[in-house]
């Protein structure tokens, strides 16, 4: 018999299993037979016809039907609804309205909806567009129109703001729980009950998490007043998001996140138990599933919850692990002798799951790639749940008539389950269920301020605004009932064939150009175990390196390399080249005169070797360069992408001729990726390469060079010359035999190299230089603070700010600067600074003492002038600099780039 651990292992191992394999398992174990499928389809057609004849779609459904995310106008309205209500100043409001309404083509939507209110709104939007659009010429009529625009702006501003509030009302039951409970009376009289959800997304500060917890606790108290039935299933309930209760709900913070979440959720669960209401844990992104199951087990194991049947879990059928999660939940409830609730939903943020998998380079998707597959999974999981009712109370959340018909057919005469729908949607369908089937119906209703609407609105539009969605098709009477009620088991094959052309597997993202680099998902235990186990043999290794040249260098003083996180912890040592050895290497260097096909094959093989040696590369990047786990993965992937990209470029340009000998002088901040990119580009073109890595990171460059040689690059075509810039760097840039220099580093050094080439090089010598600069972000009051702060943290402080692309200057609109900075402060306080070897670390050290002292001096000067707004503390050992925020008047206050975790903030009006 399978144990709880066995079921958990199945959840883990099926994270990205092949879609066909999962579907075969679901259909063979839980799928309806052919006769039942025919009955389901016939029943679904009847349901569609009854719903259409009963009444028209709701305003929400009509809006989604006309303005889904597949239209530019739908996107414009969504953006307007999300941003407008939090903008404090009239000028920005006017600019936002003009930006979103002005360019859109409202005319094509006039009269297209079956809702007179939606059509009237469309007329109003077209009139608004005609008023606010700028005239193309400057005649008298255009002057008059400009005057009308100026006079009309206050009216338009007021009207649009009111319209956006009304739009919010269609999606949100009430701005507070008392108002929501009052508005809920209408459907309570029809026999429905509610599950309330407090609007808002993931907390990014501890203060935000505390506010969400208080809001949930207060909501339970309010709901308790109307929870009058002895049967918990008849009472309203509450849905909560774990990401709202802890600011770092992610695998890297598992040791803290799970127990703290369990404590908070446990407290809310006990309050819900006392109120005799249900408490549902909402499902979130696929990468958080493992954490949520850990937390659920911890909370349910509390003996104080024994006898309470109201603990609920949401399971997303579009996830490939859904069926195995149900098995695990059933096993857990059985082991603990509990009854729980499970809300089965199709799933949210499908687009994000697909895109994330492609970007991360993982083997496959965590979700199904077609609507048919998701619908099949939903029906099979529903069948599975209906066989678990001794321990699980199923809650089927759907607006789809076919899914409803399937559940009713599978259930037969049983009524030990309920249906659920979203507020403002599926009303007619669920009203028919209440009337004809006598089953329970619950409404999932968001509660909160309209300014919190964005993420919820996006989900609703993504799920229900697509052309293929049931809600959209139901509102469109030109789509036949038979088409809407199509059997997904029948359409699966056609959908899969269409999907293969639309949705590219992560590995094939850049095909036919090149293979995508392999990724490691550190939220997945299988990938995490591989990362840790492959890196482990190199945790204490001492690397030794010397110049890799045609003429071997066997003597010279060894230079020790230390871990920037631990000043006295040696990583290895390197024998540096001197000026004469550099000149000798130039004498022995030769262009790589192999055919293009051979060069291309060798570079591709090198990419494969990089990936095969990922354990050593990860270890060396962490220990020599101070890279965190996420940064080591990103760097390896970038290096592999460079190799494959330039291999393909060589194939595209077979007639191009090499320049000759190229010096590649690379930096320490991307000691593998930029080193590899420079070298690969030069080699792909057939040049001979003399590579000088940064003084601080010669060991990773030596490993890369050895792998390139192992792949087949001849030694005369690639030589490595670690050494000082003043000697080796000068020799490699100031010799007439050098035909070009690739350099990444400071502007001052680039200028020195330029002078060297001008004085000693050939007239046509090439200099490709990537140098410093100051990157800025401008955030006005339309920017969503949570999203903006998250991006600021990533851009300014990831990699300890040691990126050429790092954010250096943030311009904030003065009206919103204070709350923005308060949120930024809170988000910074949630960061972990320390040993980059550990997954929990967000920010590692800067590269060396020189960098540490320069950055610290800049921060100290700002502090002395009263301009240091915040700075985090750091460990005592190592070259750590606490992320800092400094007030400036503008970009002109900075004389140079401060290459570290320092963000400068200016305000504007």
Report each predicted region and the residues it spans.
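Positively charged, amphipathic and often flexible ligand-engagement surfaces
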Residues: 1-517
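Structural signal for hydrophobic packing residues in well-ordered secondary-structure cores
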Residues: 51, 81-88, 188, 220, ...
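Generic beta-strand/beta-sheet core signal
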Residues: 197-199, 240-243, 278-284, 314-316, ...
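Long, K/E/R/D-enriched contiguous segments that form extended
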Residues: 204, 270-275, 286-300, 307-313, ...
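Terminal low-complexity tails and localization/encapsulation signals of metabolic enzymes
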Residues: 447-448, 452-455, 459-587, 594-612, ...
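Residue-level signal for inorganic ion chemistry
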Residues: 568, 589, 599, 621, ...
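Rossmann-like NAD(P) dinucleotide-binding subdomain of oxidoreductase/dehydrogenase enzymes
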Residues: 622, 648-789
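ALDH superfamily catalytic-core signature
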Residues: 707-712, 734-735, 740, 748-891, ...
């Amino acid at each position: 018999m399978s144990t709880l651990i066995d079921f958990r292992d199945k959840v883990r191992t099926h994270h990205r299993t092949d879609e066909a394999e999962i579907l075969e398992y679901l259909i063979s174990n839980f799928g309806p037979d052919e006769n039942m499928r025919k009955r389901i389809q016939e029943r679904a057609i009847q349901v569609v016809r009854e719903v259409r004849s009963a009444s028209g779609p709701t305003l929400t459904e009509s809006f989604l039907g006309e303005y889904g995310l597949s239209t530019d106008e739908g996107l414009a309205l969504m953006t307007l609804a999300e941003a407008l209500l939090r903008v404090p100043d009239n000028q920005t409001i006017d600019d936002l309205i003009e930006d979103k309404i002005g360019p859109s083509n409202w005319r094509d939507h006039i009269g297209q909806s079956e809702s007179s209110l939606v059509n009237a709104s469309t007329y109003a939007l077209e009139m608004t567009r005609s008023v606010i659009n700028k005239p193309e010429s400057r005649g008298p009529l255009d002057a008059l129109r400009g005057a009308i625009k100026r006079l009309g702006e206050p009216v338009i501003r007021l009207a649009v703001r009111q319209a956006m509030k009304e739009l919010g009302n269609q999606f949100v039951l009430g701005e507070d729980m008392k108002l929501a409970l009052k508005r809920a009376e209408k459907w309570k009289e029809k026999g429905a009950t509610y599950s309330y959800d407090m609007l808002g997304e993931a907390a990014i500060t501890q203060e935000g998490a505390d506010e969400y917890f208080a809001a949930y606790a207060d909501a339970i108290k309010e709901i308790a007043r109307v929870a009058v039935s002895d049967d918990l299933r008849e009472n309203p309930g509450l849905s909560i998001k774990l990401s709202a209760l802890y600011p770092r709900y992610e695998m890297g913070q598992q040791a803290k996140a799970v127990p703290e979440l369990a404590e908070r959720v446990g407290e809310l669960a006990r309050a819900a138990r006392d109120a005799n209401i249900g408490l549902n844990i909402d499902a979130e992104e696929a990468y958080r599933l493992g954490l949520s199951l850990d937390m659920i087990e911890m909370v349910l194991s509390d003996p104080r919850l024994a006898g309470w049947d109201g603990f609920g879990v949401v399971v997303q059928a579009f996830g490939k692990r859904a069926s195995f999660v149900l098995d695990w939940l059933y096993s857990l409830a059985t082991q603990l002798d509990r009854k729980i609730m499970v809300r089965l939903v199709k799933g949210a943020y499908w687009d994000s799951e697909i895109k994330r998998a492609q970007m991360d380079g993982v083997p496959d998707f965590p979700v199904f790639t077609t609507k048919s597959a998701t619908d099949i999974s939903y029906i099979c999981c529903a069948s599975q749940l209906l066989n678990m009712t001794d321990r699980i109370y199923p809650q089927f959340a759907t607006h789809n008539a076919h899914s409803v018909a399937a559940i009713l057919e599978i259930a037969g005469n049983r009524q030990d389950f309920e249906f659920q729908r979203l507020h403002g949607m599926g009303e007619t369908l669920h009203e028919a269920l209440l009337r004809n089937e006598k089953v329970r119906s619950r409404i999932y209703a968001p509660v909160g301020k309209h300014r919190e609407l964005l993420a919820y609105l996006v989900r609703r539009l993504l799920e229900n605004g697509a052309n293929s969605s049931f809600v959209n098709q139901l509102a469109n009477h030109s789509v036949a009932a038979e088409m809407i009620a199509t059997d997904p088991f029948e359409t699966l094959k056609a959908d899969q064939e269409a999907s293969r052309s639309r949705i590219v597997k992560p590995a094939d993202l850049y095909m036919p150009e090149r293979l995508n680099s392999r990724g490691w998902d550190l939220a997945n235990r299988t990938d995490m175990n591989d990362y840790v186990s492959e890196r482990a043999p190199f945790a204490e290794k001492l690397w030794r390196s010397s110049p890799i040249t045609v003429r071997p260098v066997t003597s010279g003083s060894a230079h020790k390399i230390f871990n920037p996180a631990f000043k006295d912890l040696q990583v290895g040592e390197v024998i540096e080249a001197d000026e004469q050895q550099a000149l000798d290497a130039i004498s022995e260097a030769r262009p790589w005169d192999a055919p293009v096909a051979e060069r291309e094959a060798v570079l591709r093989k090198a990419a494969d070797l990089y990936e095969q040696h990922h354990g050593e590369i990860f270890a060396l990047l962490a220990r020599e360069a101070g890279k965190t786990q996420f940064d080591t993965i990103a760097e390896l992937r970038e290096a592999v992408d460079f190799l494959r990209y330039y291999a393909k470029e060589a194939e595209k340009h077979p007639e191009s001729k090499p320049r000759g000998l190229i010096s590649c002088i690379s930096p320490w901040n991307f000691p593998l990726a930029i080193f590899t990119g420079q070298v690969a580009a030069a080699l792909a073109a057939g040049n001979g390469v003399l590579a000088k890595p940064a003084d601080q990171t010669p060991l990773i460059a030596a490993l890369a060079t050895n792998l390139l040689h192992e792949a087949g690059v001849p030694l005369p075509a690639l030589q490595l010359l670690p050494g000082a810039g003043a000697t080796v760097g000068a020799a490699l840039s100031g010799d007439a035999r050098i035909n070009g220099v690739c350099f990444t580093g400071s502007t001052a050094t680039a200028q020195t190299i330029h002078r060297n080439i001008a004085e000693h090089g050939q007239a046509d010598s090439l200099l490709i230089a990537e140098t410093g600069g100051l990157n800025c972000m401008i955030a006005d009051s339309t920017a969503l603070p949570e999203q903006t702060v998250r991006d600021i943290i990533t851009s300014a402080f990831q990699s300890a700010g040691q990126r050429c692309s790092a954010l250096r200057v943030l311009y904030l609109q003065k009206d919103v600067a204070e709350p923005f900075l308060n949120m930024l402060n809170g988000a910074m306080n949630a960061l972990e600074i320390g040993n980059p070897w550990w997954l929990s670390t967000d920010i590692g050290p800067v590269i060396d003492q020189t960098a540490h002292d320069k950055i610290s001096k800049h921060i100290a000067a700002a502090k002395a002038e009263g301009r240091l707004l915040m700075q985090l503390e750091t460990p005592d050992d190592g070259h750590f600099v606490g992320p800092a925020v400094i007030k400036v008047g503008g970009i002109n206050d900075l004389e140079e780039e401060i290459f570290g975790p320092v963000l400068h903030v200016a305000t504007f009006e």
